[in-house]
Swiss-Prot record:
Belongs to the class I-like SAM-binding methyltransferase superfamily. RNA M5U methyltransferase family. TrmA subfamily. The active site is at C322 (nucleophile), E356 (proton acceptor). Dual-specificity methyltransferase that catalyzes the formation of 5-methyluridine at position 54 (m5U54) in all tRNAs, and that of position 341 (m5U341) in tmRNA (transfer-mRNA). S-adenosyl-L-methionine binds at Q189, Y216, N221, E237, D297. This is tRNA/tmRNA (uracil-C(5))-methyltransferase. The lineage of its organism: Bacteria, Pseudomonadati, Campylobacterota, Epsilonproteobacteria, Campylobacterales. It catalyses: uridine(54) in tRNA + S-adenosyl-L-methionine = 5-methyluridine(54) in tRNA + S-adenosyl-L-homocysteine + H(+); uridine(341) in tmRNA + S-adenosyl-L-methionine = 5-methyluridine(341) in tmRNA + S-adenosyl-L-homocysteine + H(+). GO terms for cellular component: cytosol. It comes from the Bacteria.
Amino acid sequence: MRCVHFGECGSCTLALPYEDQLNFKANFIADKFREFFDGELEIFSSKPQRYRSRAEFGIWHENDEIYYTMHGSRSKFIKISECLKVDESIAALMPRLLEELGTSNELKSKIFGVEFISTSELCAVILLYHKRLEGLEAAFSELAKRLGVKIVARSRGQKISSDERELCDSFEINGLRYALNFGDSAFIQPNKCVNEKMISWAMNAVQNAEDMLEMYCGHGNFTIPLAGKFRRVLATEISKSSIANALKNCERNGIGNIKFLRMSAEELMSAFSGERGFRRLEGVNLADFTFSHVLVDPPRAGLEASVINFIKNYENIVYISCNPQTLYENLKELSLTHKATKFAMFDQFANTNHIECGVVLKKR
């Protein structure tokens, strides 16, 4: 990776040719998890550059000029002129946005950050401010028209959108195309190519399927494509906006066998144990489901002990992890009742130390 900021920017940390990076990560995962899995590790690579469809940068003000910034490796931040990780759409947009903002005192005043999201249909730019935004609606709308993007401006307690277009991305899994709506503040997998590989791997890992229970489902990134493998799916998520988009995604993709519930993991477990009732479960009889599989895609903190004890009851577990250390700790407990039958490494973030994994566990 020939980035002019490598070594100063704290984002990319692996100064190795890409194949060597991949081998380094694969060897690390194989060694770390050898006590749980002694089969063949499946390895899924990324493009070395231009793979991120979502990226965030700080904005630095200096002598009436503004610059993009990133966290520095030896300093709090560094000014950057380019980023080789962002995809082609974002890379082309970055200098144009900076030029537009730099020529407008009202738009550059008190701005401290910017986020880019590119989809197959639309690019969105989220501008972050330390000031009130009243009276700037027209300026944001004109900026959006000049750049050909959707602008979302945010300040504490305020949000202004240049238009009402929704973010939606499409992808192909095993020959089938899907389109998913998501919110501008929702979590998404920023590496589209590797995300497709993750979903395809999970689909191919499912055998002898009946019903699926999914926790931490978001807007349906895994749920929607996997639904075709199961008779019925029950999927839970705590975010109200993500559930709203998940419901839209069912309709958009013509899928009718998923029941989405806005529930935390703790609430779901209480519902299953019968400790309390929930109005959100009206019309849903949990006893009607025959869950052959449970899919979990938790945050970096991994699964809490109560969730581990809960999912131990299921025959098959598909665990998607964004943190090898918490995955390792969770597998210490899950391996008491389940055996890892498939293990995959997904290189979501080339040139960094970040590693994502997928594990299929079957009850002993």
